[in-house]
């Protein structure tokens, strides 16, 4: 964890099967706050990073020392670290483990549930969704991301039995949990190593379904293309059929391709796809020049990733080419004349 040696040598607690620093020691908090400052200077806004979970405190960096609850940093010390994150990161979202109006709820933070489907939905205060609601943080998802990790003991049962919807051992209804929390991302290491699953191909299909239920699901619900004085007037509407918005600025591009599929022009619009809430829509329009050569052309839409090698946003419409270009119109320049 990068804790200085002198903090190990002068710690309060003895060795067991692991080394645990004294989280109440202000010297440790000083070190962690200094780390966060430099961490933000180097990585805030780095397009390779989607979100950062705050970590640093408690077992596995999950902000608890269960079952030794008296060993956790005080609320004041926790607030110092959250304040350091809030100061150091303006662009990259930071996520906290627990929703709490006395600490994490005071800052521009998202949240992550690392016992997803196990302690996500319930009436008592131990459940993640209940904590969001009781601390009046259940609308945070509209501006800041929610995510987590499927409870480790639930991962193989879900993949084996394909009971993500009905609930498996240790698991609540996964899709209900996603819908209620508006989760955008989820960790599930078993979906990658597949160790212990009965049917790997079925497990992969199940994992794909779990993944596709998260976050935004953008579809082009309306489109209109008109020719006027050598220009193409293009308008379209994007609807979010998912459970959460997009949290980064991504911009749609209008692509004109010839009959052989070669791209002859690509125009990125200045209007972002960010922030379209579930079941809401946003309209876009632009005007571009007709291609110079005669022939048949296709008008398509997609949203390129600003990161080199990154995957674009692909609209969920079926009429796509190359798996990413959503076709909205075709035209023949001879007929336009």
Language-model-detected regions and their locations in the chain:
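Extracellular/luminal regions of secreted and cell-surface proteins that mediate adhesion/ECM remodeling
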Residues: 208-337
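Catalytic-core regions of glycoside hydrolase
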Residues: 51-192
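Residue-level marker of positions within ordered structural domains that often coincide
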Residues: 44, 57, 90, 241, ...
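Hydrophobic/aromatic-rich, well-ordered segments within soluble, folded domains that form packed cores
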Residues: 47-57, 61, 232-239
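Catalytic cores of secreted or luminal carbohydrate-active enzymes
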Residues: 170-223
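An active-site-proximal structural segment forming one wall of the substrate-binding cleft
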Residues: 1-2, 7-12, 16-53, 77-84, ...
